[in-house]
Amino acid sequence: MAVKNKLIHEVRAVKSKKELKYIIKAQRITETVLRYIIVKLKTGVTELEVANLIKKSFTKHGAPILAFPPIVAFGKNTANIHHEPNKTKLRNGDTIMFDIGCTVNHYCSDMTRTYFWGKPN
């Protein structure tokens, strides 16, 4: 069984041009969504509101299937890399963390970015 698993792993490690096309498309959509979200941010918005906007934006951009639930964290919540978005509001001076990704033809993007809102504390 271990030999079969190793062979499958090796075959999957090399991507065809078509597979690379799907991965690149997923990443480009993810980058587009994040640029859109950054422009829409405002003081007082909650992590949950932003996470929901991310989901809607992926659908709008042709990728309704997410790679995983979006992670949006503000302030002290950014210390938890697997934070689940909640009603925490964005405040001036907060650190913001996004971990988002989508799926295109079963190939996923996964992007994590950190920003500061206003002047960092």
Segments and roles (model prediction):
Residues M1-N121:
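Active-site neighborhoods and metal-handling regions in enzymes and metal-associated proteins
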